Amino acid sequence: MSISGDVDPAFWAGKRVFLTGHTGFKGSWLSLWLQKMGAHVTGFALTPPTTPSLFEEARVVGGMTSIIGDIRDREVLERALLAADPEIVIHMAAQPLVRASYDDPVGTYATNVMGTVHLLEAVRKACGVRAACVVTTDKCYENREWAWGYREDEAMGGYDPYSNSKGCAELVTSAYRRSFFGGASKAAIASARAGNVIGGGDWAADRLIPDILRAVEKGEPVLIRNPLAIRPWQHVLEPLSGYLTLCQALWHDPAVAADAWNFGPRDEDAQPVQWIVERMCEAWGDSAGWTRDESVQPHEAHYLKLDISKARAGLHWRPRWSLGTALESIVVWHRAWRAGDDMHDYCHSELERFAGARFVHAA
């Protein structure tokens, strides 16, 4: 069967999906998307990491089974996964912040590395799982500050504990795939590496877009640590569409799909932080501006891009929204939230705008 780059609602209708990290920013968006397509979703995660949170503001819990638990607790995770009896597993639970990893390196490694081991061990015992996607990050690569994008076969590395732990998670996933998941009767295992994800509903600390929104709401200049740092920015729905497409491919053609995959933006959307800040301030209006934070900062990479040629050719996946469109959507989303709009309905409308004609309401 040929692999299509489209997310197929008919495929997901009725599928049993186990999703870790469902209370986070990306996990909440993915939970809503899966619910809208008629999947039976069981989520496993810690309580929402921020107040406010997208999970609560969009009433994500209403359409799924939500289990509050810690992936560092192997027995609890295993019981939850086996009880859910999933056909598809998507592993997104993580300690996701570079700066937080400097404060708690032990917790970061325990969550991002051993949490992945615990998840894959549970999948080994779950007879009904046919596809599993382990989500890591673009920062898993050994960053050499190259001007070109990293490909999936580049060396794993990572300067800081977060990035390094995600490189380790990639190595764990590769070892488990080769050691335990070969053969037609086994689950097909893949890993997915996404760029810097942005979108409405992100209130995390020490992340660019939430920091910008917090500052402009207060009428204060945005403090920017590294204005010339270049990242592969993408709207949150872009990589999520990649994960869903990858799971479909794992189901239909595991020999091709059981591998590592990059999901990033077009080359022209790898922009410096200053470019993002200036356009967000312009879109917000009200004389919003920025200034450089001159305090001493921990190390962060200056230049990072992803090569998505493999996903284009092998999965027929492609980015849909430009960076400009993504930034505009964030400002509109945030203004709607501030105005008291129903964010559950608004998020569903956002999903339809992103998916366009491909999106079909589940019966």
Model regions and ranges:
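C-terminal "lid/loop" region of Rossmann-like NAD(P)-dependent oxidoreductases
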Residues: 258-262, 271-277, 282-303, 345-351
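Glycine-rich loop motifs involved in handling phospho/adenylate chemistry
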Residues: 22, 228-232, 296-300
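Conserved C-terminal active-site "lid" loop/helix of NAD(P)H-dependent oxidoreductases
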Residues: 236, 259-260, 296-317, 339
